[in-house]
Design a protein with these regions (language model features):
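Short, solvent-exposed recognition patches
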Residues: 1-112
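Surface-exposed amphipathic alpha-helical segments
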Residues: 114-143
Length: 143
């Protein structure tokens, strides 16, 4: 079976190896910071009748407070204004480690201080697409 999609390019030291077919062609990169964590973000969006709709977001997160997967979860819960205790997440395999996924979002701790977060529009794609995108992301070699 061939999974249709395209390459997502490089973002802040990572390569996004797969973007689902049907993700918008308008691609934008952003840099931001929230609660002492820096975000390097790439967004795929498409034009809709009343403006634009985001289909896929990939965030590379850097910050001293991101030392464990549970701390990444708590940080993202605050960022998304969710109660981390009420956020239904499940583990997914990520190389020799695990990440957490739920509701079209997949994230993992690369190492202390560095995490990656993937979000897909669940009205456009199956929630599992976030895991497929996450599984395609590789850290680039230094230098």
């Amino acid at each position: 079976m061939t999974v249709q999609g395209r390459d997502g390019g490089d973002l802040d030291g990572f390569h996004v190896g797969w973007v689902p077919e049907g993700a918008g062609e308008l691609v934008s990169d952003f840099a931001s910071e929230w609660e002492d964590v820096s975000f390097a973000s790439r967004v795929w969006e498409r034009a809709v009748e009343d403006g634009y709709r985001v289909d896929l977001r990939v965030h590379v997160l850097r910050g001293e407070r991101l030392t464990t997967l549970l701390q990444v979860r708590d940080f993202l819960a605050g960022y998304h204004e969710r109660d981390s205790a009420e956020w239904p997440l499940a583990e997914f395999g990520r190389g020799d480690g695990v990440g957490l996924t739920g509701g079209g979002e997949a994230f993992w701790l690369v190492r202390p201080g560095l995490a990656v977060d993937v979000l897909v529009d669940v009205d456009r794609f199956d929630a599992e697409a976030s895991i497929e995108v996450a599984s395609s992301i590789r850290e680039l070699p230094l230098g």
